[in-house]
Amino acid sequence: PAPEFKAVSDTVYVKTNGGSVRVRSSCDTSTSDNVVANVGNATELTRTGTSEKWDRVEYEGKTVYISSDFVTTEVPKEPETSAASSNAAADGHVTLNHSWKYADFAKIKSGAAVLYRSTASEKKNKVIAVNAGHGTKGGTSVKTQCHPDGTAKVTGGTTGAGATSAVAVSTGMTFSDGTAESKVTLAMAKVLKDKLLSAGYDVLMIRDGEDVQLDNIARSVIANNAADCHIALHWDSTTSNKGAFYMSVPDVASYKNMEPVKSHWQQHNALGASLVEGLKSAGVKIFSGGSMAMDLTQTSYSTVPSVDIELGDKASDHSQSTLNQLGDGLVAGVKAYFGQ
């Protein structure tokens, strides 16, 4: 049910840490279908109603809704930004908002993602969440619920089938040459960020350093609310240098009928297939048919197109030239998915 609004009439401003916040046509954060626009820090709005968690405002002649956490009656200061790469400035931290759908399931949530804005001449007006897998200190000492409805996992993986809880963030594997997976996923994320920024995409770096205190649920919920899609970067734990693939949504009726999977699984699989095609076009070796069915915490809580892409395994080369090749393939996949 829609919240009850107390009628008001005043001027308010959007207050963010420099990033943008979504305004919606309804008070529902479980879908991105109702997003009208992403509005930036200090945007002036006319407020017509207030409720406990939402404000009703006028934006470009439309009545829209914005989370009250991002509204202030005083003109906010512009945040200090630092040049993040030759193509963007760090535009602000995005933290987990407790009012966002599924946020309460997160256990490790004090960290922040970092939003980078493209300064390319042709902007795509899309935010890509790039999630460098693993890299949360203490992530294995905490467990989170596998599914929002409390049901058990339908496939194996880091956590076996039948489990209802899983480690909040696993440590990941170690490459055959002794390098930690979390180190390589971060290096890959930085390469991908720069290539996406150059191509006109804004990038939400879920993990922008060695450690981020955000578990897999927090990472997914932040991406749900601050990005147009969510790409988690991983390498598999096998040792055969088998190639890249994406984790597809298992073809299990009970799982596909559980929300939010039910409303979004086709988007997840379509994004994964596009990324694999992009990698293939860049000359990257692809494993089998390019996908492997897996019940993941990420997929179980995602309300935007979301995928875990495995870019190889323990035996794979992870030199800078290989990361560049992988980055080119992933960008091609993103462009294809969005038809850009």
Each model region followed by its residue ranges:
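SH3/SH3-like beta-barrel fold
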Residues: 42, 55-59
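SH3/SH3-like (including bacterial SH3b) beta-barrel domains
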Residues: 25-50
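Short, flexible active-site loop motifs that bind/organize anionic cofactors or intermediates
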Residues: 32, 61, 175
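Catalytic-site microenvironment of enzymes
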Residues: 1-19, 43-44, 50-51, 67, ...
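Acidic/polar N-terminal loop/beta-strand segments that form early-domain functional surfaces
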Residues: 26, 60, 133
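Short, compositionally biased
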Residues: 58-69
